[in-house]
Swiss-Prot record:
Protein name: Queuine tRNA-ribosyltransferase
Catalytic activity: 7-aminomethyl-7-carbaguanine + guanosine(34) in tRNA = 7-aminomethyl-7-carbaguanosine(34) in tRNA + guanine
Pathway(s) of this molecule: tRNA modification; tRNA-queuosine biosynthesis
Presence of the UniProt keyword Ribonucleoprotein in the record: no
Gene (UniProt): tgt
Segments crossing the lipid bilayer: none
Task performed by this protein: Catalyzes the base-exchange of a guanine (G) residue with the queuine precursor 7-aminomethyl-7-deazaguanine (PreQ1) at position 34 (anticodon wobble position) in tRNAs with GU(N) anticodons (tRNA-Asp, -Asn, -His and -Tyr). Catalysis occurs through a double-displacement mechanism. The nucleophile active site attacks the C1' of nucleotide 34 to detach the guanine base from the RNA, forming a covalent enzyme-RNA intermediate. The proton acceptor active site deprotonates the incoming PreQ1, allowing a nucleophilic attack on the C1' of the ribose to form the product.
Length: 383
């Protein structure tokens, strides 16, 4: 893997424009990765994902391991061939899903034992096993197996958790090398909301050495102010010559605020999940949050396009009234068109960010984003 930093934004922000080059192609950063949990982005053909401009998608190690299983995907030569996607894939390690099982799992130094949510069978996932699964998937970017620290966490709980994740991180690197895996491996910073613990985690990861670094443990229920507080210092602790990935954060305004603070990569289920609930992200300020809730009766006879500024298939071909009708009838096409639009909105947002950095007008882009929503630009309180 290679990361090329092309430009840092003019002005007070730390926004960066770069390219991540992996075995299956290039990823323009800042980048948003659509989530394809089971080897598919819900409601989207692979060609649809290409059409909306995505350079990379995210797959889920945990779910693909349980179903269909690596023994099936191995027969196809990896996840790319299995799902017919020829661009880059990042897979998470399975850690977040395992730890979300709550009482169904038991954590030890060796790994995590749990009952399969599919059939109740006893299953064990370790750092080594996570690396082996992701090797079978042939992910372009592999994530270390870590303990996702819950929120809230006491200082001692957060410290114990990050220290376990560091030990697991070393085991991931060792197994990754043992397998001869030439794909990239990213480490994950933990430490909850405690700055000194975040610094301790980052120092430990740097000592181990990874191809890129991710900020974990955010978007887990904490107030936005606490998330921003972590982002005010965290990206600056990460190497400038490596990609910086913020895991699971996906509101458009949160992505923009993270970019202002130096983050390069993002993923979230929000655009696809919200699409299935009739929430469309739009360029304007429909509700001061840039969202059209298409099930509202005001759209029943609305002949206008969903977003006049959007070039997606949905906006170019259908009215708000038709989308309202599809949602009221619970037609599958409604969710599909919403997904196409929302993912295109996110890719247009990222392209706009990249262009603005390239053209030395990023601060103006940020101001326009908030102006359209009738909001002031939040202050930058960088450390």
């Amino acid at each position: 893997m290679q990361f090329t930093l092309h430009k840092t934004a003019a002005g007070e922000s730390r926004a960066r424009r770069g390219t991540v080059t992996v075995n299956h192609g290039e990823i323009r950063t800042p980048a948003f990765m659509p989530v394809g949990t089971y080897g598919t982005v819900k409601g989207m053909l692979p060609r649809d994902i290409e059409d909306i401009g995505a350079d990379i998608i995210l797959g889920n190690t945990f779910h693909l391991w349980l179903r269909p299983g690596t023994e099936v995907i191995d027969k196809f030569g990896g996840l790319h061939q299995f799902m017919n996607w020829n661009k880059p894939i990042l897979t998470d390690s399975g850690g977040f899903q395992v730890f979300s099982l709550g009482a169904m799992r038991k954590i030890t130094e060796e790994g995590v034992a749990f009952k399969s949510p599919i059939d109740g069978a006893k299953v064990f996932l370790s750092p080594e096993k996570s690396m082996q699964i992701q090797y079978s998937l042939n992910s372009d970017i592999v994530m270390q197996f870590d303990e996702c620290t819950p929120y809230p966490a006491t200082y001692s709980e957060a410290q114990k958790s990050l220290e376990l994740s560091l030990r697991w991180g070393q085991r991931c690197v060792d197994e990754h090398k043992k397998l001869g895996n030439t794909n990239a491996l990213f480490g994950i910073v933990q430490g909850s909301m405690y700055e000194d613990l975040r610094r301790q985690s980052m120092d430990g990861l740097l000592e181990i050495g990874f191809d890129g670094y991710a900020i974990g443990g955010l978007s887990v229920g904490e107030p936005k102010e606490e998330m921003i507080s972590v982002l005010n210092y965290m990206p600056e602790l990460m190497p400038a010559d490596k990609p910086r990935y913020l895991m699971g954060v996906g509101k458009p305004e949160d992505i923009l605020e993270a970019v202002r603070r130096g983050v390069d990569m993002f993923d979230c289920v929000m655009p696809t999940r919200n699409a299935r609930n009739g929430h469309y992200f739009v360029t304007g300020n429909e509700d001061n949050q840039g969202i059209v809730r298409i099930r509202n009766s005001q759209y029943r006879e609305d002949q206008g396009p969903l977003d006049p500024e959007c070039d997606c298939y949905c906006c170019q071909n259908f009215s708000r009234a038709y989308l309202y009708h599809l949602n009221k009838c619970k037609e599958m096409l409604g969710a599909q068109l919403a997904t196409i639009h929302n993912l295109r909105y996110y890719q247009r947002l990222m392209q706009g960010i990249r262009d603005a950095i390239d053209e030395d007008r990023f601060d103006e882009f940020v101001a326009d984003f908030y102006h359209r929503r009738g909001q002031d630009v939040p202050p930058l309180e960088l450390k």
